[in-house]
Amino acid sequence: PAAAGAEPQRLVDINEYVVRGNTVLDNRAIEAAVYPFLGPQRSLGDIEGARDALQAAYQEKGYQSVYVELPEQQVSGGVVYLQVTETTVGRVRVVGAKHYSPVELREEVPALEEGKVPDFAQVQRELAQVNRTPGRQVLPMVREGQRPGTMDVDLQVEDKNPWHASIGLNNDYSADTRHLRSVVSLGYDNLWQLGHAISLTYFTAPQDQDNAKVWSGSYTAPLSQRWSVQLSGYQSDSDVATVGSMNVVGQGHSYGVAAIYSLPVTGLWSHSFSFGVDFKDFEEQTRIGGNNDRVPIKYAPLTLSYNGFRYTERSQLALGLSLVAGTGSLLGYGDDDEEFDRKRYRAKSGFGVLKGDLNHTLTFGGDWQVATKAAFQLASGPLISNEQFAAGGATSVRGYLAAENTADDGYLLSQEWRTPSLGRFLGKRAGGYVNDWRFYVFAEGAQLRLQDALPEQDDDFSLASVGIGTRAQLADWLSGSLDWAFPLLEGTNTDKHDSRLHFSVQASF
Protein backbone atom coordinates (compact mmCIF):
# COMPACT_ATOMS: atom_id res chain seq x y z
CA PRO A 1 0.00 0.00 0.00
CA ALA A 2 2.82 2.43 0.84
CA ALA A 3 4.71 1.26 -2.21
CA ALA A 4 1.60 1.52 -4.27
CA GLY A 5 1.51 5.25 -3.60
CA ALA A 6 5.15 5.75 -4.72
CA GLU A 7 5.66 7.31 -8.12
CA PRO A 8 7.26 4.81 -10.51
CA GLN A 9 10.83 5.70 -11.57
CA ARG A 10 11.04 7.03 -15.11
CA LEU A 11 13.22 4.97 -17.44
CA VAL A 12 14.63 6.20 -20.74
CA ASP A 13 16.72 4.83 -23.56
CA ILE A 14 20.17 6.46 -23.73
CA ASN A 15 22.03 6.21 -27.02
CA GLU A 16 24.58 9.00 -26.55
CA TYR A 17 26.17 11.31 -23.97
CA VAL A 18 27.17 14.69 -25.38
CA VAL A 19 29.92 16.34 -23.31
CA ARG A 20 30.14 20.11 -23.64
CA GLY A 21 33.04 22.32 -22.49
CA ASN A 22 35.79 19.69 -22.58
CA THR A 23 39.25 20.65 -23.88
CA VAL A 24 41.59 18.28 -22.05
CA LEU A 25 40.25 14.71 -22.28
CA ASP A 26 40.34 12.85 -25.58
CA ASN A 27 37.23 11.19 -27.01
CA ARG A 28 38.44 7.70 -26.15
CA ALA A 29 38.76 8.53 -22.43
CA ILE A 30 35.28 10.09 -22.41
CA GLU A 31 33.73 7.13 -24.20
CA ALA A 32 35.38 4.67 -21.80
CA ALA A 33 33.93 6.56 -18.83
CA VAL A 34 30.30 6.82 -19.99
CA TYR A 35 29.96 3.64 -22.09
CA PRO A 36 28.72 1.42 -19.19
CA PHE A 37 25.77 3.81 -18.73
CA LEU A 38 24.40 3.60 -22.29
CA GLY A 39 21.50 1.43 -23.32
CA PRO A 40 17.74 0.97 -22.96
CA GLN A 41 15.68 1.46 -19.83
CA ARG A 42 18.15 3.65 -17.96
CA SER A 43 17.29 5.53 -14.77
CA LEU A 44 18.34 8.88 -13.33
CA GLY A 45 20.80 6.95 -11.18
CA ASP A 46 22.50 5.65 -14.33
CA ILE A 47 22.80 9.18 -15.72
CA GLU A 48 24.31 10.42 -12.46
CA GLY A 49 26.64 7.42 -12.58
CA ALA A 50 27.86 8.55 -16.01
CA ARG A 51 28.53 12.02 -14.63
CA ASP A 52 30.44 10.58 -11.65
CA ALA A 53 32.46 8.27 -13.89
CA LEU A 54 33.45 11.17 -16.13
CA GLN A 55 34.36 13.24 -13.08
CA ALA A 56 36.55 10.36 -11.88
CA ALA A 57 38.24 10.19 -15.29
CA TYR A 58 39.27 13.84 -14.97
CA GLN A 59 40.51 13.24 -11.43
CA GLU A 60 42.53 10.23 -12.53
CA LYS A 61 44.26 12.29 -15.22
CA GLY A 62 45.21 14.93 -12.66
CA TYR A 63 42.63 17.55 -13.67
CA GLN A 64 41.45 18.42 -10.17
CA SER A 65 40.04 21.79 -11.24
CA VAL A 66 37.46 20.30 -13.62
CA TYR A 67 33.82 19.82 -12.55
CA VAL A 68 31.16 17.82 -14.43
CA GLU A 69 27.53 18.94 -14.10
CA LEU A 70 24.23 17.40 -15.15
CA PRO A 71 22.13 20.34 -16.40
CA GLU A 72 18.35 20.25 -16.29
CA GLN A 73 17.04 18.81 -19.54
CA GLN A 74 14.41 16.70 -21.20
CA VAL A 75 15.93 13.53 -22.59
CA SER A 76 14.79 13.19 -26.18
CA GLY A 77 16.16 11.12 -28.98
CA GLY A 78 18.26 9.14 -26.51
CA VAL A 79 20.73 12.03 -26.01
CA VAL A 80 21.94 13.23 -22.57
CA TYR A 81 24.04 16.38 -22.18
CA LEU A 82 26.84 16.70 -19.61
CA GLN A 83 28.39 20.12 -18.96
CA VAL A 84 32.10 20.39 -18.10
CA THR A 85 33.46 23.46 -16.30
CA GLU A 86 37.24 23.81 -16.55
CA THR A 87 39.04 26.20 -14.21
CA THR A 88 42.25 27.44 -15.78
CA VAL A 89 45.38 28.95 -14.25
CA GLY A 90 45.12 32.71 -13.93
CA ARG A 91 48.28 34.13 -12.38
CA VAL A 92 51.30 32.31 -10.93
CA ARG A 93 53.57 34.02 -8.42
CA VAL A 94 56.73 32.87 -6.65
CA VAL A 95 56.64 34.12 -3.06
CA GLY A 96 59.30 34.05 -0.35
CA ALA A 97 62.39 33.18 -2.41
CA LYS A 98 65.46 34.75 -0.80
CA HIS A 99 68.39 32.88 -2.33
CA TYR A 100 66.93 31.33 -5.49
CA SER A 101 65.76 33.12 -8.62
CA PRO A 102 61.92 33.38 -8.78
CA VAL A 103 62.14 33.29 -12.57
CA GLU A 104 64.10 30.03 -12.56
CA LEU A 105 61.75 28.48 -9.99
CA ARG A 106 58.73 29.45 -12.07
CA GLU A 107 60.21 27.81 -15.16
CA GLU A 108 60.76 24.56 -13.24
CA VAL A 109 56.97 24.07 -12.92
CA PRO A 110 55.78 24.35 -16.55
CA ALA A 111 52.57 22.41 -15.78
CA LEU A 112 51.23 25.61 -14.17
CA GLU A 113 50.84 27.40 -17.49
CA GLU A 114 48.67 30.48 -17.39
CA GLY A 115 45.47 30.06 -19.37
CA LYS A 116 45.64 26.26 -19.31
CA VAL A 117 43.83 23.64 -17.24
CA PRO A 118 46.51 22.34 -14.84
CA ASP A 119 47.41 18.68 -14.55
CA PHE A 120 48.00 18.59 -10.80
CA ALA A 121 49.57 15.14 -10.96
CA GLN A 122 52.24 16.59 -13.26
CA VAL A 123 52.52 19.64 -10.99
CA GLN A 124 53.27 17.35 -8.04
CA ARG A 125 55.91 15.48 -10.03
CA GLU A 126 57.60 18.73 -11.04
CA LEU A 127 57.50 20.08 -7.49
CA ALA A 128 58.99 16.83 -6.20
CA GLN A 129 61.87 17.37 -8.60
CA VAL A 130 62.24 21.00 -7.49
CA ASN A 131 62.27 19.99 -3.83
CA ARG A 132 65.12 17.53 -4.34
CA THR A 133 67.48 20.49 -4.10
CA PRO A 134 68.84 20.64 -0.52
CA GLY A 135 67.79 23.63 1.52
CA ARG A 136 64.74 24.47 -0.58
CA GLN A 137 61.04 23.61 -0.27
CA VAL A 138 58.30 24.87 -2.60
CA LEU A 139 54.59 24.44 -1.79
CA PRO A 140 51.67 25.52 -4.03
CA MET A 141 48.90 27.66 -2.53
CA VAL A 142 45.74 27.80 -4.70
CA ARG A 143 43.06 30.47 -4.38
CA GLU A 144 40.19 31.85 -6.46
CA GLY A 145 41.45 33.86 -9.40
CA GLN A 146 40.85 37.54 -10.01
CA ARG A 147 39.19 36.68 -13.32
CA PRO A 148 36.06 34.47 -13.41
CA GLY A 149 36.76 30.82 -14.15
CA THR A 150 40.41 31.01 -13.11
CA MET A 151 42.58 30.13 -10.13
CA ASP A 152 45.69 31.94 -8.97
CA VAL A 153 48.64 29.94 -7.64
CA ASP A 154 51.33 31.13 -5.25
CA LEU A 155 54.48 29.02 -5.10
CA GLN A 156 55.51 29.49 -1.47
CA VAL A 157 59.28 29.12 -1.13
CA GLU A 158 61.24 28.34 2.01
CA ASP A 159 64.93 28.40 1.13
CA LYS A 160 68.20 28.47 2.98
CA ASN A 161 71.46 30.12 2.04
CA PRO A 162 73.04 27.84 -0.61
CA TRP A 163 76.40 28.28 1.09
CA HIS A 164 77.06 25.48 3.59
CA ALA A 165 80.08 24.45 5.61
CA SER A 166 80.86 21.90 8.28
CA ILE A 167 83.71 20.87 10.53
CA GLY A 168 83.91 17.56 12.35
CA LEU A 169 86.13 15.63 14.72
CA ASN A 170 86.09 11.90 15.51
CA ASN A 171 88.35 9.05 16.58
CA ASP A 172 87.67 6.65 13.70
CA TYR A 173 91.34 5.81 13.15
CA SER A 174 93.17 2.91 11.51
CA ALA A 175 95.99 0.75 12.85
CA ASP A 176 99.25 2.37 14.00
CA THR A 177 98.07 5.94 13.36
CA ARG A 178 97.18 8.80 15.67
CA HIS A 179 93.66 8.59 17.06
CA LEU A 180 91.93 11.76 15.89
CA ARG A 181 90.43 12.50 12.49
CA SER A 182 89.00 15.81 11.32
CA VAL A 183 87.02 16.76 8.25
CA VAL A 184 86.22 20.20 6.89
CA SER A 185 83.83 20.80 3.99
CA LEU A 186 82.54 23.79 2.07
CA GLY A 187 79.87 23.86 -0.61
CA TYR A 188 77.50 26.00 -2.65
CA ASP A 189 74.26 24.59 -4.11
CA ASN A 190 73.06 27.26 -6.54
CA LEU A 191 75.83 28.44 -8.83
CA TRP A 192 74.73 30.76 -11.64
CA GLN A 193 71.15 30.54 -10.25
CA LEU A 194 70.93 27.29 -12.24
CA GLY A 195 71.09 24.78 -9.39
CA HIS A 196 74.71 23.84 -10.06
CA ALA A 197 76.38 22.49 -6.90
CA ILE A 198 80.04 22.47 -5.92
CA SER A 199 81.70 21.05 -2.81
CA LEU A 200 85.22 20.70 -1.42
CA THR A 201 86.29 18.50 1.51
CA TYR A 202 89.56 18.10 3.40
CA PHE A 203 90.12 15.03 5.59
CA THR A 204 93.17 14.62 7.81
CA ALA A 205 94.68 13.35 11.06
CA PRO A 206 95.20 16.62 12.96
CA GLN A 207 97.82 15.14 15.32
CA ASP A 208 99.98 13.97 12.39
CA GLN A 209 98.85 14.86 8.89
CA ASP A 210 101.24 12.32 7.38
CA ASN A 211 98.86 9.63 8.67
CA ALA A 212 96.00 10.82 6.49
CA LYS A 213 95.56 13.74 4.13
CA VAL A 214 92.83 13.65 1.50
CA TRP A 215 91.33 16.43 -0.64
CA SER A 216 88.08 15.66 -2.44
CA GLY A 217 85.57 17.65 -4.44
CA SER A 218 82.61 17.43 -6.78
CA TYR A 219 80.68 19.59 -9.24
CA THR A 220 77.14 18.71 -10.32
CA ALA A 221 75.43 20.47 -13.22
CA PRO A 222 71.77 19.84 -14.15
CA LEU A 223 71.37 19.57 -17.92
CA SER A 224 67.59 19.15 -17.97
CA GLN A 225 64.77 18.11 -15.68
CA ARG A 226 66.02 14.51 -15.75
CA TRP A 227 69.70 14.62 -16.74
CA SER A 228 72.70 15.98 -14.87
CA VAL A 229 76.45 15.50 -15.07
CA GLN A 230 78.83 15.20 -12.14
CA LEU A 231 82.58 15.72 -12.00
CA SER A 232 84.32 14.36 -8.91
CA GLY A 233 87.76 13.49 -7.65
CA TYR A 234 90.13 13.17 -4.75
CA GLN A 235 93.85 13.49 -4.04
CA SER A 236 95.32 11.27 -1.32
CA ASP A 237 98.62 11.39 0.53
CA SER A 238 98.78 9.11 3.56
CA ASP A 239 100.97 6.81 5.61
CA VAL A 240 98.81 4.01 6.99
CA ALA A 241 100.27 1.04 8.83
CA THR A 242 98.58 -2.28 8.16
CA VAL A 243 100.24 -5.43 9.45
CA GLY A 244 103.18 -5.64 11.83
CA SER A 245 106.16 -3.69 10.50
CA MET A 246 104.70 -3.22 7.03
CA ASN A 247 103.62 0.34 6.16
CA VAL A 248 101.78 1.34 3.00
CA VAL A 249 102.56 4.88 1.88
CA GLY A 250 99.76 5.93 -0.44
CA GLN A 251 99.95 8.81 -2.88
CA GLY A 252 97.43 8.95 -5.64
CA HIS A 253 94.34 10.46 -7.16
CA SER A 254 91.07 9.61 -8.81
CA TYR A 255 89.12 11.87 -11.17
CA GLY A 256 85.78 10.89 -12.62
CA VAL A 257 82.79 11.98 -14.65
CA ALA A 258 79.27 10.52 -14.49
CA ALA A 259 75.94 11.10 -16.20
CA ILE A 260 72.94 10.90 -13.85
CA TYR A 261 69.36 10.25 -14.93
CA SER A 262 66.58 10.89 -12.40
CA LEU A 263 63.43 8.92 -13.14
CA PRO A 264 59.99 10.47 -12.62
CA VAL A 265 58.79 10.15 -9.04
CA THR A 266 56.43 7.17 -8.74
CA GLY A 267 54.28 7.32 -5.63
CA LEU A 268 56.59 7.50 -2.63
CA TRP A 269 59.66 6.38 -4.60
CA SER A 270 62.35 8.41 -6.33
CA HIS A 271 64.98 6.67 -8.46
CA SER A 272 68.12 7.57 -10.36
CA PHE A 273 70.66 5.80 -12.54
CA SER A 274 74.21 6.91 -13.23
CA PHE A 275 76.97 5.80 -15.56
CA GLY A 276 80.52 7.04 -15.30
CA VAL A 277 84.22 6.45 -15.54
CA ASP A 278 86.96 7.13 -12.97
CA PHE A 279 90.59 7.63 -13.87
CA LYS A 280 92.63 6.29 -10.96
CA ASP A 281 96.37 6.58 -10.44
CA PHE A 282 97.95 5.35 -7.19
CA GLU A 283 101.63 5.25 -6.36
CA GLU A 284 102.12 3.16 -3.26
CA GLN A 285 105.41 2.35 -1.59
CA THR A 286 105.56 -0.69 0.66
CA ARG A 287 108.26 -0.69 3.34
CA ILE A 288 109.15 -3.98 5.08
CA GLY A 289 112.04 -3.49 7.46
CA GLY A 290 114.66 -1.57 5.48
CA ASN A 291 113.37 -2.63 2.05
CA ASN A 292 111.21 -0.43 -0.17
CA ASP A 293 109.00 -1.69 -2.98
CA ARG A 294 107.12 0.73 -5.22
CA VAL A 295 103.82 -0.70 -6.51
CA PRO A 296 102.15 1.96 -8.69
CA ILE A 297 98.89 1.17 -10.47
CA LYS A 298 96.78 3.05 -12.98
CA TYR A 299 93.33 2.05 -14.27
CA ALA A 300 89.95 3.43 -15.39
CA PRO A 301 86.91 1.44 -14.20
CA LEU A 302 83.38 2.01 -15.49
CA THR A 303 80.53 2.19 -12.97
CA LEU A 304 76.80 1.70 -13.51
CA SER A 305 74.76 2.60 -10.43
CA TYR A 306 71.17 2.67 -9.22
CA ASN A 307 69.88 4.64 -6.24
CA GLY A 308 66.36 4.50 -4.85
CA PHE A 309 64.70 6.39 -2.02
CA ARG A 310 61.34 5.92 -0.34
CA TYR A 311 60.13 8.33 2.35
CA THR A 312 56.95 8.17 4.39
CA GLU A 313 55.96 9.67 7.71
CA ARG A 314 57.23 6.60 9.57
CA SER A 315 59.73 4.99 7.23
CA GLN A 316 62.84 6.06 5.33
CA LEU A 317 64.50 3.65 2.93
CA ALA A 318 67.60 4.15 0.77
CA LEU A 319 68.91 1.53 -1.67
CA GLY A 320 72.07 1.48 -3.75
CA LEU A 321 73.41 -1.00 -6.30
CA SER A 322 76.58 -0.62 -8.39
CA LEU A 323 78.40 -2.64 -11.02
CA VAL A 324 82.08 -1.74 -11.41
CA ALA A 325 84.04 -3.05 -14.39
CA GLY A 326 87.75 -2.69 -15.02
CA THR A 327 88.54 -1.76 -18.61
CA GLY A 328 92.20 -2.76 -18.88
CA SER A 329 93.73 -0.53 -21.52
CA LEU A 330 90.45 -0.31 -23.47
CA LEU A 331 90.25 3.46 -22.96
CA GLY A 332 93.94 3.96 -23.67
CA TYR A 333 94.56 4.48 -19.97
CA GLY A 334 95.73 1.97 -17.42
CA ASP A 335 98.07 -0.88 -16.67
CA ASP A 336 97.83 -4.42 -18.02
CA ASP A 337 97.29 -7.72 -16.22
CA GLU A 338 101.01 -8.08 -15.47
CA GLU A 339 101.03 -4.88 -13.41
CA PHE A 340 97.84 -5.89 -11.60
CA ASP A 341 99.32 -9.31 -10.81
CA ARG A 342 102.43 -7.60 -9.44
CA LYS A 343 100.32 -5.53 -7.08
CA ARG A 344 98.05 -8.45 -6.08
CA TYR A 345 98.57 -12.09 -6.94
CA ARG A 346 96.25 -13.16 -9.81
CA ALA A 347 94.47 -9.78 -9.96
CA LYS A 348 93.21 -8.80 -13.44
CA SER A 349 92.80 -5.42 -15.08
CA GLY A 350 89.41 -6.55 -16.41
CA PHE A 351 87.91 -7.16 -12.97
CA GLY A 352 84.22 -6.96 -12.11
CA VAL A 353 82.58 -6.00 -8.81
CA LEU A 354 78.92 -5.98 -7.77
CA LYS A 355 78.18 -3.98 -4.62
CA GLY A 356 75.07 -2.82 -2.82
CA ASP A 357 73.86 -1.10 0.31
CA LEU A 358 70.62 -0.55 2.22
CA ASN A 359 69.62 1.87 4.98
CA HIS A 360 66.17 1.67 6.55
CA THR A 361 64.67 3.48 9.54
CA LEU A 362 61.22 2.51 10.82
CA THR A 363 59.39 4.57 13.46
CA PHE A 364 56.77 2.86 15.63
CA GLY A 365 54.11 4.21 17.94
CA GLY A 366 55.54 6.21 20.79
CA ASP A 367 58.47 7.30 18.56
CA TRP A 368 60.49 4.09 19.06
CA GLN A 369 62.76 3.35 16.10
CA VAL A 370 64.52 0.42 14.47
CA ALA A 371 67.36 1.17 12.04
CA THR A 372 68.89 -1.39 9.69
CA LYS A 373 72.04 -1.03 7.61
CA ALA A 374 73.40 -3.64 5.21
CA ALA A 375 76.09 -3.77 2.54
CA PHE A 376 77.73 -6.40 0.35
CA GLN A 377 80.36 -6.86 -2.34
CA LEU A 378 80.96 -9.72 -4.79
CA ALA A 379 84.10 -9.77 -6.93
CA SER A 380 84.88 -11.70 -10.11
CA GLY A 381 88.35 -12.56 -8.77
CA PRO A 382 91.23 -11.22 -6.66
CA LEU A 383 91.17 -7.43 -6.39
CA ILE A 384 93.84 -4.84 -5.74
CA SER A 385 93.51 -3.19 -2.34
CA ASN A 386 91.85 -0.03 -3.69
CA GLU A 387 88.77 -2.00 -4.79
CA GLN A 388 88.38 -4.33 -1.81
CA PHE A 389 85.52 -4.42 0.69
CA ALA A 390 86.48 -2.93 4.07
CA ALA A 391 84.89 -3.58 7.46
CA GLY A 392 85.47 -2.15 10.91
CA GLY A 393 85.17 1.30 12.42
CA ALA A 394 82.58 3.79 13.63
CA THR A 395 80.56 3.67 10.40
CA SER A 396 80.95 -0.07 9.82
CA VAL A 397 81.41 -2.56 12.68
CA ARG A 398 81.90 -0.57 15.85
CA GLY A 399 84.43 -1.82 18.39
CA TYR A 400 87.10 -2.35 15.73
CA LEU A 401 89.56 0.00 14.04
CA ALA A 402 88.64 1.68 10.77
CA ALA A 403 89.01 -0.75 7.86
CA GLU A 404 90.44 -3.37 10.23
CA ASN A 405 89.94 -6.02 7.57
CA THR A 406 89.69 -5.80 3.79
CA ALA A 407 88.93 -8.56 1.30
CA ASP A 408 87.50 -9.24 -2.15
CA ASP A 409 84.03 -10.38 -1.08
CA GLY A 410 82.10 -9.39 1.98
CA TYR A 411 78.86 -8.41 3.61
CA LEU A 412 77.89 -6.30 6.60
CA LEU A 413 74.74 -6.08 8.72
CA SER A 414 73.96 -3.57 11.48
CA GLN A 415 70.84 -3.24 13.63
CA GLU A 416 69.98 -0.41 16.02
CA TRP A 417 67.04 -0.20 18.44
CA ARG A 418 66.42 3.43 19.43
CA THR A 419 64.48 5.05 22.26
CA PRO A 420 61.96 7.84 21.64
CA SER A 421 63.60 11.22 21.20
CA LEU A 422 64.14 13.17 24.40
CA GLY A 423 64.02 16.33 22.33
CA ARG A 424 60.25 16.62 22.63
CA PHE A 425 60.55 16.51 26.43
CA LEU A 426 63.67 18.67 26.80
CA GLY A 427 63.24 21.00 23.84
CA LYS A 428 61.44 23.83 25.66
CA ARG A 429 63.20 23.22 28.97
CA ALA A 430 66.57 23.46 27.23
CA GLY A 431 65.64 26.67 25.47
CA GLY A 432 64.69 24.89 22.26
CA TYR A 433 68.25 23.74 21.58
CA VAL A 434 67.64 19.98 21.81
CA ASN A 435 66.07 19.00 18.48
CA ASP A 436 66.67 15.28 18.77
CA TRP A 437 68.36 13.07 21.39
CA ARG A 438 68.10 9.31 21.39
CA PHE A 439 69.77 6.37 23.13
CA TYR A 440 70.14 3.00 21.44
CA VAL A 441 71.58 -0.49 21.60
CA PHE A 442 73.14 -2.10 18.56
CA ALA A 443 74.45 -5.36 17.17
CA GLU A 444 76.47 -5.61 13.98
CA GLY A 445 78.86 -7.86 12.14
CA ALA A 446 80.69 -8.51 8.90
CA GLN A 447 82.05 -11.49 7.03
CA LEU A 448 84.87 -11.10 4.48
CA ARG A 449 86.60 -13.53 2.14
CA LEU A 450 89.89 -13.21 0.28
CA GLN A 451 90.03 -15.00 -3.07
CA ASP A 452 93.16 -16.97 -4.06
CA ALA A 453 94.95 -16.09 -0.84
CA LEU A 454 98.67 -16.83 -0.56
CA PRO A 455 99.67 -19.76 1.71
CA GLU A 456 100.69 -17.43 4.55
CA GLN A 457 97.52 -15.31 4.31
CA ASP A 458 94.24 -15.70 6.15
CA ASP A 459 91.41 -15.90 3.65
CA ASP A 460 88.41 -15.49 5.94
CA PHE A 461 87.61 -12.71 8.41
CA SER A 462 84.70 -12.25 10.79
CA LEU A 463 83.84 -9.22 12.89
CA ALA A 464 80.95 -8.86 15.35
CA SER A 465 80.08 -6.51 18.18
CA VAL A 466 77.30 -5.26 20.43
CA GLY A 467 77.04 -2.02 22.32
CA ILE A 468 75.12 1.03 23.45
CA GLY A 469 75.23 4.64 22.34
CA THR A 470 73.59 8.01 22.14
CA ARG A 471 73.14 10.52 19.33
CA ALA A 472 71.94 14.12 19.55
CA GLN A 473 71.09 17.07 17.32
CA LEU A 474 71.41 20.40 19.12
CA ALA A 475 69.79 23.46 17.55
CA ASP A 476 70.22 23.30 13.77
CA TRP A 477 73.99 23.24 13.63
CA LEU A 478 75.58 20.91 16.20
CA SER A 479 75.37 17.11 16.26
CA GLY A 480 77.29 14.36 17.95
CA SER A 481 77.36 10.70 18.91
CA LEU A 482 79.06 8.50 21.50
CA ASP A 483 79.20 4.70 21.20
CA TRP A 484 80.56 2.03 23.53
CA ALA A 485 81.18 -1.17 21.56
CA PHE A 486 82.11 -4.65 22.78
CA PRO A 487 83.87 -6.85 20.16
CA LEU A 488 82.68 -10.44 20.23
CA LEU A 489 85.37 -11.83 17.90
CA GLU A 490 89.13 -11.48 17.61
CA GLY A 491 90.22 -8.95 15.00
CA THR A 492 93.48 -8.33 13.20
CA ASN A 493 94.25 -5.36 15.46
CA THR A 494 91.55 -5.69 18.13
CA ASP A 495 91.39 -8.22 20.95
CA LYS A 496 88.18 -10.06 21.68
CA HIS A 497 86.16 -8.40 24.49
CA ASP A 498 88.45 -5.32 24.42
CA SER A 499 85.78 -2.60 24.41
CA ARG A 500 86.21 0.66 22.53
CA LEU A 501 84.61 4.13 22.62
CA HIS A 502 83.77 5.91 19.38
CA PHE A 503 82.89 9.59 19.37
CA SER A 504 81.96 12.07 16.67
CA VAL A 505 81.00 15.73 16.79
CA GLN A 506 80.11 17.98 13.86
CA ALA A 507 79.16 21.61 13.48
CA SER A 508 77.27 22.62 10.33
CA PHE A 509 76.72 26.17 9.11
Regions found by a protein language model. Give the residues of each.
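Repeated loop/turn-to-beta-strand initiation elements of outer-membrane beta-barrel proteins
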Residues: 163-165, 192-198, 225-231, 266-271, ...
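Transmembrane beta-barrel domains of outer membrane proteins
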Residues: 156-158, 187-189, 218-222, 232, ...
